């Protein structure tokens, strides 16, 4: 720092002398720090140095030389880098041209086709629906139907004490669902053939799994089905604990266990029951035994009312006539009557029409009749009016009047097959309070 101080002082002196020379002034001359005065005794004083600088007398000179050498080296280094800097300056225009040639995002977007808002909304909606679908990795049983969408069997469940306090006894499971009772036998047998012998599902369990696939579409997901299977497994565990508490000896042993031990036992049983339910669910989902027995499942395919009517009519044979002794009923399966007016065809229901008689049998009218004295009890004739299977019979000219003789009770009544075909529906006469009489 001392060398720099001296350099600055010298520069100031030179600058001040130049300024004084320009204005015609002359600076006083100093000699070793003593200014000559008039009539003064001149006495030289010893040289003074800065603090700590009297040991080395040429320290300032050395610092000045070192500063000069540093400046020279910096100047030389800068001069050596000038050619390289010049080359870089010359290359800058070419680099700018290359940058202009490069594609910018704005230019790329301008070349893209325009997409309307409706198309964008449609694409976004489709993407959201696709993300909602859960695609599980295919397992080693991927060759069997939809095994890739099965509920994983390696999941471990754990419930705390608060969750076990919630009872699941309100869940269905003790009996078959009402709408499955007519078909549960065939579906259960088919399900038994598909399952392993160690699973051995019951009819009630088959009905539960069957019903899960008839839930609302928004509820038929793997997550919701998995939670329902967990609740079923929890209910099975709670039913087992209830049986233990009903036995006094087992109840005492169970109460002696700590809460932690009880929790471990319940969770272990929960996973065992859950794995069983998951295996049965996956088998039922892949094979759908309820669809294998679909031809017999009329209630689920046609509705309850239509299925019952179709089943009842299908049980009626083509030839229907039976006889009995006196004071017995004559059961007629099918009959056909034709009137002379545009009344179409009257068809009896498939239920057995029982006509009671004490001494003789009520005459069965099979021919075309227009008048007569014998009256058929209308309360025994159950007509199926209208319905989806009803139809309009074309007009036919009246046929010749004929009446078959009355048959005694001991004689069998036979009906012609050609006139006993089953006819569902028809147009009937409005006046049904009185049957046509026989001439």
Curated annotation (Swiss-Prot):
Q: Where in the cell does this protein reside?
A: Secreted; Host nucleus
Q: Does the keyword Glycosyltransferase apply?
A: no
**UniProt motif RxLR-dEER: location:** 48-65
Chief location bin: secreted
| Cellular component terms per the entry's GO annotation | extracellular region; host cell nucleus
Q: Which domain of life is it from?
A: Eukaryota
Q: Which N-terminal stretch is annotated as signal sequence?
A: 1-21
Q: Which UniProt keywords apply?
A: Host nucleus, Secreted, Signal, Virulence
Regarding protein family, the annotation reads: Belongs to the RxLR effector family.
Please give the function described in this protein's UniProt entry.
Answer: Secreted effector that acts as an elicitor that induces cell death in host plant cells.
Comment text on domains = The RxLR-dEER motif acts to carry the protein into the host cell cytoplasm through binding to cell surface phosphatidylinositol-3-phosphate.
User: Know the name of this protein?
Assistant: Secreted RxLR effector protein 117
Organism expressing this protein natively: Plasmopara viticola
């Amino acid at each position: 720092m001392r060398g720099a101080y001296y350099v600055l002082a010298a520069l100031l002196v030179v600058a001040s002398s130049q300024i004084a020379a320009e204005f015609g002034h002359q600076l006083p001359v100093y000699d070793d720090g003593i200014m000559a005065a008039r009539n003064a005794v001149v006495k030289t004083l010893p040289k003074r140095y800065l603090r700590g600088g009297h040991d080395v007398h040429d320290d300032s000179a050395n610092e000045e030389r070192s500063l000069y050498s540093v400046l020279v080296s910096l100047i030389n280094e800068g001069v050596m880098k000038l050619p390289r800097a010049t080359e870089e300056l010359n290359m800058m225009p070419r680099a700018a041209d290359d940058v202009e040639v490069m594609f910018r995002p704005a230019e790329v977007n301008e070349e893209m086709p325009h997409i309307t808002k409706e198309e964008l909304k449609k694409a976004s909606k489709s993407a959201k629906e696709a993300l909602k679908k859960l695609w599980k990795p295919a397992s080693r049983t991927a060759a069997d139907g939809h095994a890739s969408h099965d509920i994983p069997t390696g999941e471990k469940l754990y419930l705390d004490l608060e969750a076990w306090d919630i009872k699941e006894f309100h869940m269905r499971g003790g009996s078959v669902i009402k709408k499955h009772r007519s078909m549960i036998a065939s579906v259960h047998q088919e399900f038994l053939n598909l399952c392993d012998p160690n699973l051995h599902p019951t009819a009630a369990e088959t009905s539960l799994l069957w019903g899960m696939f008839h839930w609302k579409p928004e509820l038929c997901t793997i997550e919701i089905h998995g939670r329902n299977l967990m609740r079923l497994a929890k209910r099975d565990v709670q039913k087992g604990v209830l049986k233990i508490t009903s036995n006094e000896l087992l109840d005492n042993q169970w109460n002696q266990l700590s809460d932690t031990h009880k929790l471990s036992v319940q969770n272990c049983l929960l996973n065992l029951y859950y794995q069983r339910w998951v295996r049965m669910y996956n088998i039922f989902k892949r094979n759908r035994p309820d669809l294998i027995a679909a031809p017999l499942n009329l209630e689920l395919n046609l509705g309850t009312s239509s299925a019952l009517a179709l089943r009842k009519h299908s049980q009626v044979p083509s030839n229907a006539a039976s006889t009995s002794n006196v004071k017995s009923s004559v059961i007629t399966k099918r009959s056909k009557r034709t009137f002379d007016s545009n009344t179409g065809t009257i068809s009896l229901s498939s239920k057995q029409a029982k006509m009671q008689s004490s001494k003789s049998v009520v005459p069965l009218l099979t021919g075309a009749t227009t008048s007569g004295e014998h009256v058929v009890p209308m309360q025994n004739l159950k007509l199926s009016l209208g319905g989806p299977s009803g139809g309009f019979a074309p007009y036919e000219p009246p046929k010749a009047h004929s009446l078959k003789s009355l048959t005694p009770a001991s004689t069998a009544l036979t009906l012609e097959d050609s006139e006993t075909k089953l006819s569902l529906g028809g147009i009937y006469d409005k006046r049904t309070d009185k049957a046509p009489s026989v001439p």
